[in-house]
Amino acid sequence: MTGNVVVIGGGTAGMEAAGLLAKEGLKVTLIEKENEIGGHIKDWYHIFPDRRNSMEVIEYLRNKINHDNITLITGNTINGVEKKSGSFHISTVTGKEIRADAVLIATGFDLFKSERKEEYGYGIYDNVITSADLESMFRKGEVKLTDGEKPGRIGFIHCVGSRDEKVGNVYCSKLCCVTAVKQAMEIKEQFDEAKVFCFYLDMRMGGALYEELYRESQEKYGINYIRGKVSEVGVTISNKLVVKIEDTLAGRPLRMELDMLVLMAGMEMSDSGKLISETSNLKTGENRFFAPADHHIGSNKSNVKGIFYAGACTAPMNITETISHARSAVSDIVDYLRNGQ
């Protein structure tokens, strides 16, 4: 078949979809705002639930887009998408104009900016880091405190920027719990004598093998899970972090000293997605992600005929779900182009 499709976003969803669209014979322009494709996954070390190296998935995706039908544009952001006479006109911030018969938005998510939760001390106290910061340390093989010493007591705060009315994000980001479990296990593998604590609201392990990973973290690695909300983080004269928490299972307040505190940052609609929604009349939901036409039978379709969605631009998703969502988007696009506009 013939046709031109623009895919906006060069992460997991965009790369998977672009490769499949090209395989169908369509001409694909893949646009990524960063200078390098790969999205968030390229910044991660091991991924759950099997803890494989993320580069295995990246290589799979890169091989997918190594196709003559794909034109890759990096370091460019979309200004808007306009529909004229049945086709779409996409403009970029650099002034590039692209015409397409269909558009796939795969702009993904941004991590919650943890400095917005001032009570946790990110950007204020040494050794308060985010899950993304820790993943970068894993990749570099340099998990250490700011003074170069090994951490002996490490805490993880779940739901930072999720399930939080104060910051306006009442939804669950879905992946924070399992990411904390995975990272806690990796910490213990590097520092066997370390004491690791996870402070959680509820453990939401709703994916394949997630519950098994959670059980293993307790039985094999000795991770300590404390149910309750952290109210405040401070620092001692000796530069130890102090966490105050209400242990809701034990029914008593806790005060704990730590060497390192990891904030499990949740997901938000990406800034690039927000810009597109504002300039292209695309609807967003109460969670401020793109709102699909129908959550059950039209999760890839937008309110504009010919514009489709794939991946975490519509809601938090894991890698498996993102790839499946991208594949279903390709099916909808092919059907749309084949059966006329």
Set out the residue ranges of the language-model regions.
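Residues forming the flavin
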Residues: 1-341
